[in-house]
Each structure stands twice: as C-alpha cells, then as structure tokens.
C-alpha cells in the first residue's frame, strides 16, 4: 500500500503472471492470474509485439475477459500494455520465467536480448542447476540392463525424489556394489550396499562456482560432531592421497583459479572473481543449442518460428492444468522429516503439514467442491483425485480466489514424504508414523490461528 514505482524514488515496477498465488505475486504492482500454458503464450505474444510484426502475422491470444470495474479488458490488451512498458524501459527492463519449459526460457532469453537488458548477461550464466535428465534416463536404462558395476550416490535420495523411483529401485538391485553418501539413513541409503554417513555442510570444506568466473569458498563453522567424513576425503584416501580435502582445494585454487592471488585473502573474502571475466568464453557444451544466432539477429521468419513453438494459430484448451509449486518451508522436501518445518504455516494459505490442491472458486463451483469451517475453527471440505498414467493421488481442495481459472496447484515436494514420519519424541523413543501424503489426522486449531486441513467428504476426479 502506498507503493508508487518511479525513477524519482528508485523503485522498480513489478508485473507478475502466474497460476498460483506466490509471495512475489502477492506483493507485485500488478498480478495477472494465468495458467502455465497461458503464461507461455503471453511471453510469445509479448515478444511478437516487441518485434513489431504486422497484424496479419500475429498469433492471437485466447479471448478470456478480465473484469475491472465497469470496463472489460482482455488479457490480450494487458499483454500489449506490458510489451509497451518493456519497450519504454528498454535496457532497464528484465523478463524472467520460472516455467519448466525450454520454449518459454528461450523466448524470455530472446526478449531480454531484444531489449538489451543490463541485468541479463548470457556470457555469465548462473550455475545453480547442472542436472541432465537424458543422462539420468540413460543411467536408469543401464542399471536395469545390468551394465553398471558400481554406483556412488552423493547427497541425493533418488528413491524419494525421482518420479519413476520404482525403476531406480529395480535397477539398484542389479548393481553389484553401491554406496550412498548421506547424512541420514534415508530411503536410498537403506537400499545401497554401504551407507557412508556425511557431515553437515556447516561442518565441511568445499568450493562453488556461482556463475562462470565467480567462485566461492565454503568453510566449516565447527568440527564434525559425529564420526563422519566428507565424501571427497573418502575418495582421496581410496586413491592413496595422504592429504585432506582442505589441502586438495587449496592446491587446486592456487594452480588453476588464483594464479598468484593470495589464498589467505580469498579465504578471508570467501569469494573470488576472475579479472578477465568479460572475455570469458562459454564451453561449447554450455551454449544454448536451440538458437544458432543470438536472438537480436533473428530474422522475421526465425522469430515467427520461435513464437509458433509456444503460440500456435489453433489454440486447444484443456479442462485443467497442473501448476506445481515449491513449499516455502520444505523447499524440495529434503528436510521433510523436520517437524518444525512441517508446523511452519504457509505464508499465503496459513496451512501446515498436509498437502492440498488450490482451486479457483468458479472451478470449485462447477465441480461441486466446497470448503467450510467447523465449530472449532478447523477447515473442512471435499477431496479431489488427480490421475496421470497409472498413478493417482488424493488431496484436500483449498478454494483460493487468486488461483488462475482452469488450473490446480499442489506443492511439488509433499507427495513423497515417506521418511517424513521418522520423528522421534525422545531419544530411543517410539517412532511416530504420519501419513503426510494424504492425511495427518484430525488436527484442530483455535480460531485465528493457523488453518489445519482435514477433508473427509466426497471425491472429485479432475480431468487433466
């Protein structure tokens, strides 16, 4: 309230397009509720306006109407306005997308290149994710065909996190020797040949490369509290290296990164940036493969081809779209066995523990889904069943006015909380099992406190 972005006060104007109401969206200057597919189309539509294509070359957006006072404003009109604002901001503008779609990321890339955004530097991409889905699928195939002789797993729990965990479990049984480097005896560690307990990252040495040419050093806050050893030290000892991982890092940095700069100073600062970072070249395997030229040099035909991958001329509407999001408290679910995090209320919905589906009131009314408060302040309501391939999940439905129509939003990490029930009330005490994937029991709350979900009546199948 009272926020007026302008050049004078140095505030940036923020526009959010999303399906689920996020903290960022709730604080945006303008928020438009769209399904994930509509967000991709909005990006493409915005790009074609920035490129200045003729009217007869445009791909049209769905004619959904947004009611605003007495005026009817189409989503198409709103996207045109966004494109105009981006064009006016020029180099000071930035477009980012969190959609898990290569096409959407490419169009966002192209928009930023077209605007010559100062905040966008493709030569120094962030390296926070280095996963390779194709390589993982090949590993699963090789494991199940008996082609893997030894498997080392570091700080990962595939039997918990993979969507096709059954295939990994079957393949793991065919691997003669396997080791899991993990802090806990999780699902994967319990199935491998050996479990090598790891120290906490605050007890460990390490180094990182945030983006190309930008490095950081990780220093332990305390000595390991338990009888654990870093996986790097394990491998160094196995290959006959007598020095610890600390000296290995130091030698590597002095030879390949610092090149004359003081190790003690780098350790003191915690970070180090190469002086020749502006001329740093991307490795060939890291270059974006889908665009042979930088987007600024794309011809009209190439731009239209890129847009058409997301915004076809014939639009096919689906009944519902699944819009997964990450829990603020649990993140990717690695700490799902922490009851304090399970008890932390969601900052938007005020819910704790159980997972749920967010749904727009109009969709809920169409399906006959309702929520109601009981006399003790708890929230009750209907459940919905979501099926994909041969799997299905059942979850309570939380009716959310800010949800985009035609979409439902479950948290992505909470369907697989198998080890989250490993909570002990006292040292050596009995294990308390909790069914976090569907129900946690009738949890009551006093009026005005966090809302606990417990849905017992009815079931609706959503056609995704």
Question: Language-model segments: which ranges?
Answer:
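A cross-kingdom feature strongest in bacterial/archaeal respiratory oxidoreductases
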Residues: 1-27, 124-129, 137-225, 253-426, ...
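Long, well-ordered, tryptophan-enriched scaffold segments
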Residues: 2-92, 98-99, 110, 235, ...
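Structural alpha-beta junctions
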Residues: 4, 112-121, 173-177, 238, ...
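Short hydrophobic/aromatic-enriched beta-strand-loop microsegments
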Residues: 32-35, 117-120, 195-200
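Periplasmic-binding protein-like
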Residues: 92-98, 150-155
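Gly/Ser/Thr-rich loops at beta-strand to alpha-helix junctions
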Residues: 99-104, 157-159
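Anionic-ligand anchoring segments at beta-strand to alpha-helix junctions in alpha/beta enzyme folds, i.e.
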Residues: 106-138
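Non-catalytic, well-ordered alpha-helical segments in soluble enzyme domains
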Residues: 229-254
């Amino acid at each position: 309230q009272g926020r007026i972005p302008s050049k004078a006060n140095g505030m940036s104007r923020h526009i959010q397009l999303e399906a689920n109401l996020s903290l960022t969206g709730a604080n945006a200057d303008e928020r438009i509720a769209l399904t994930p597919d509509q967000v991709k189309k909005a990006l493409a539509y915005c790009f074609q306006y920035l490129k200045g294509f003729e009217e007869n070359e445009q791909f049209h957006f769905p004619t959904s109407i947004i009611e605003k006072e007495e005026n009817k404003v189409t989503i198409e009109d709103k996207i045109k306005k966004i494109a105009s604002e981006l064009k006016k901001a020029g180099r000071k503008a930035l477009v980012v997308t969190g959609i898990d779609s290569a096409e959407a990321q490419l169009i966002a890339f192209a928009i930023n290149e077209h605007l010559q955004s100062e905040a966008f530097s493709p030569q120094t991409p962030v390296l926070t994710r280095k996963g390779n889905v194709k390589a993982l699928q090949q590993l699963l195939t090789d494991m199940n065909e008996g082609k893997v002789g030894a498997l080392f797993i570091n700080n990962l729990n595939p039997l918990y996190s993979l969507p096709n965990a059954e295939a990994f479990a079957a393949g793991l049984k065919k691997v003669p020797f396997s080791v899991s480097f993990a802090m806990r005896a999780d699902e994967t560690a319990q199935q491998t040949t050996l479990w090598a307990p790891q120290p906490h990252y605050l007890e460990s040495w390490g180094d990182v490369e945030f983006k190309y040419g930008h490095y950081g050093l990780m220093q332990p806050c305390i000595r390991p509290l338990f009888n654990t050893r870093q996986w790097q030290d394990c491998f160094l000892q196995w290959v006959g290296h007598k020095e610890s991982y600390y000296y290995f890092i130091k030698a590597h940095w002095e030879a390949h990164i610092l090149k004359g700069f003081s190790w003690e100073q780098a350790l003191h600062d915690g970070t180090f940036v190469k002086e020749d970072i502006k001329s740093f070249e991307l490795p060939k395997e890291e270059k974006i493969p889908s665009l042979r030229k930088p987007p600024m040099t794309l011809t009209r035909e190439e731009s239209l081809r890129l847009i058409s991958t997301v915004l076809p001329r014939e639009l096919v509407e689906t009944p519902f779209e699944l819009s997964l999001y990450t829990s603020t408290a649990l993140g990717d679910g690695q700490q799902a066995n922490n009851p304090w995090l399970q008890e932390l209320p969601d900052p938007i919905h005020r819910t704790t523990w159980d997972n749920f589906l967010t749904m727009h009131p109009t969709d809920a009314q169409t399906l006959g889904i309702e929520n109601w408060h009981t006399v003790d302040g708890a929230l009750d309501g209907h459940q919905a069943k979501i099926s994909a391939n041969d799997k299905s999940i059942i979850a309570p439905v939380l009716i959310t006015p800010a949800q985009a129509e035609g979409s439902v939003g479950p948290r992505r990490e909470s369907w697989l909380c198998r080890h989250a029930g490993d909570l002990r009330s006292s040292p050596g005490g009995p294990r308390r099992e909790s069914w976090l994937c569907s129900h946690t029991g009738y949890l009551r709350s006093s009026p005005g406190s966090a809302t606990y979900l417990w849905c017992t009546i009815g079931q609706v199948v959503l056609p995704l």
